[in-house]
């Protein structure tokens, strides 16, 4: 007699994925629950045990924080990545890593399918499924929430009928997604773009009004584009991000209200809390300004925008993304140094920077007697630089 087919479920411990365990079991699958820790701050032991309680045959919990930080957040930092110049790709960065781990567990356990808890309305279904099929085209992907078409009340009724525990925070009016790089908030009163986000929606950040009245200064050291130390203390990247989240969040830094163009064709209203992301991205860009030649400083943002779009749209494993990340790695060889940042009332402001790769020459920039800039050379430069414009004027402005 053949056993049930195995399926690996991306498991969060929430209502949707807990109900999905029972629903998939009823469909004839042996469910392997797979929870990837990318810095949500959840009780992983509780999630592990709950998966078994609701019917999973096996529960896997993976610590992915440093891998998430170095590879995925690392690319975002090196590229100064902001979708639509506003959103630092909080959720979008975690999806390819989660998909990759789901595929690895599926292959290790001999599963024939993978399931996720995304709805049919958002970007994440695309990100997961494109990533999974990029890595393992042979695996079937099932989206229970997309298939069962239940209203929330029907889902709760199904859970009660099948002994699936109802989470204590189910009455939370907001949909939340959180990882090391930030926290996404949507739904509830936020669906009306005129409504101000209530203060009870925030978790990582103080309001500007409640932020300290005194500024705080931090120093972040970078090596090849990535932070390696905070205030002189060497730390793993995920630890630096965690600490900066706390420090910058206290000062009200990182709140973002975004009318976002989703991949699936609709606009959505999203709130984000990204204190570390905003702070570290500003510090990183400031160090690039110190160490990049002009041509690179002007050209790189063009590719940054393309890469942000690729990642937002679920194409992390596309060859174009791989090529652009390789370009970023090449540019970051000179991005070494320390940036001093002022944190005050919602603003993270770089106020000092130094680098062994600095292209800033005080002797060339100064207006004092120490000036080494050859001002006499400017006459010939100006004449040659403006020559095409001058010739055009002589020919056409008659």
UniProtKB/Swiss-Prot annotation:
L-aspartate binds at residues 119, 123-124. Transmembrane segments: none annotated. It is found in: Cytoplasm. It catalyses: L-citrulline + L-aspartate + ATP = 2-(N(omega)-L-arginino)succinate + AMP + diphosphate + H(+). ATP binds at residues 10-18, 117. Disulfide bonds: none annotated. Homotetramer. This is Argininosuccinate synthase. The lineage of its organism: Bacteria, Bacillati, Bacillota, Bacilli, Lactobacillales. The gene is argG.
